[in-house]
UniProtKB/Swiss-Prot annotation:
Family: Belongs to the three-finger toxin family. Short-chain subfamily. Type I alpha-neurotoxin sub-subfamily.
Tissue: Expressed by the venom gland.
UniProt name for this protein: Short neurotoxin 1
Alphabetical UniProt keywords: Acetylcholine receptor inhibiting toxin, Disulfide bond, Ion channel impairing toxin, Neurotoxin, Postsynaptic neurotoxin, Potassium channel impairing toxin, Secreted, Toxin, Voltage-gated potassium channel impairing toxin
GO molecular function: acetylcholine receptor inhibitor activity; potassium channel regulator activity; toxin activity
Originating organism: Hydrophis lapemoides (Persian gulf sea snake)
């Protein structure tokens, strides 16, 4: 599976993953809205929005 792995609003980059899902985490801090993308579907702390999906590059 191919997942996007760029941070926040950086240009799109992808990585090949062994997992069958991709994730996109969104949260706010003193720098504004932060976005992290990657492979799998991790546990997150309260206050962090997590979206998991199961198709190539679905987490852009």
């Amino acid at each position: 599976m191919t997942c996007c792995n760029q941070q926040s609003s950086q240009p799109k980059t992808t990585t090949n993953c062994a997992e069958s899902s991709c994730y996109k985490k969104t949260w706010r801090d003193f720098r504004g809205t932060r976005i992290e993308r990657g492979c799998g579907c991790p546990q997150v702390k309260p206050g962090i929005k997590l979206e998991c999906c199961h198709t190539n590059e679905c987490n852009n």
